[in-house]
A protein has these predicted regions:
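A nucleotide-sugar donor-handling region in carbohydrate enzymes
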Residues: 2, 79-148, 173-175
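Hydrophobic acceptor-binding patch used for acceptor engagement in glycosyltransferases
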Residues: 56, 214-215, 233
Length: 312
């Protein structure tokens, strides 16, 4: 007598997590690093008309975080460049703060300070081929001619510094809205056909840094993390707004990273290259002293998994 066959159990539905970020260099970099540690989960982009996701990771987009929370989706909100403006956090199940161990700051109740959210260490090319520029102006309005002129001047000085050694620019990474990019490049006086421009949506910075001799960047915590991971010299651009001014002050006070002098870009770049080894030694010692193991991305990913197990 044959034994009855048992129907196979259907596979459990795969968990879906929405991942989204403000369209800014720092926000997208943090989201990219966190997402790389959630490979076993189905990650989706912007909300759609389909079933609600099981959870969400949102970097710096407080409007989206509040909307998802109101609709019943548990949210891990990540502040990528420091506490939100005014210290006002959006409604979310979990609040995570990206604050590297070398940066001083106060503890906030109900906030997980996760340490450094860093990119994976990448193999370096045998020889550097040139410099990389990243300029953060995510809110640039092409109709604001004064703001466009300031950003254009910053980009022009950054490009001059990047070419200090005669090597070509490997890439210029921008997060300016697409309608503002042509105005920005025009204000910088750059040949738009010759300049190797990539948008924030192309996630190019870490790939380019593998072959870079210098990173010239807006003052971003992620720029320090990226350059430190790649052991690439770093030169910061002057601040273009109040948020960048606060970040620039914190970074330079804590690490001593050099700031570009628009009147002497070549000298600024040369100084940054010569200061790179002592700079990264100081940063490494500060991370070790603070107990920061550069695993902040993994800590955020762990919060996501815990939310999936117990969302409320």
């Amino acid at each position: 007598m044959s034994s009855p066959t048992t129907a196979p159990h259907p596979a459990p539905p795969r968990l879906r997590v929405l991942v989204a970020a403000r369209p800014a260099l720092e926000s997208r970099a943090v989201l990219r690093h966190v997402s790389s540690h959630l490979t076993e989960i189905e990650l989706t982009g912007e909300p759609d008309a389909g079933p609600a996701p099981d959870a969400a990771v949102v970097c710096d987009d407080d409007v989206l975080a509040a909307r998802l929370s109101a609709s019943g989706v548990p949210v891990v909100f990540v502040a990528s460049g420091g506490p939100p403006p005014g210290g006002i956090w959006p409604p979310s199940a979990v609040r995570c703060l990206h604050r590297p161990g070398w940066l001083a700051g106060q503890r906030a109740k109900g906030v997980h300070a996760v340490g450094t959210i860093a990119p994976p260490r990448a193999a370096r090319a045998r020889a550097a081929r040139g410099a990389v520029v990243q300029l953060s102006t995510p809110d640039l309005d092409p109709a604001d001619h004064a703001a466009v002129a300031r950003a254009g001047a910053a980009l022009r000085a950054a490009a001059e510094a990047a070419r200090y050694d005669g090597k070509p620019l490997l890439g210029v990474v921008l997060d300016a809205p697409v309608p503002a990019r042509s105005a920005l490049l025009s204000a910088a006086g750059e040949d738009t056909d010759a300049l190797p421009v990539v948008g924030v949506e192309e996630a190019a910075t870490e790939r380019l840094l593998a072959e870079a001799s210098l990173l010239v960047s807006s003052p971003l915590l992620t720029a320090v993390n990226q350059a430190h991971a790649a052991r690439v010299p770093l030169l910061l651009l002057p601040a273009l707004d109040a948020d960048q001014a606060g970040r620039l002050a914190g970074i330079t006070e804590a690490t001593g990273v050099g700031v570009l002098d628009a009147a002497a870009p070549d000298t600024s770049a040369d100084r940054a290259v010569r200061a790179a080894d002592p700079l990264w030694s100081r940063v490494s010692r500060a991370l070790e002293h603070s107990g920061d193991d550069r695993r902040g991305a993994q800590r955020v990913a762990r919060q996501v998994r815990q939310l999936l197990l117990a969302p409320f």
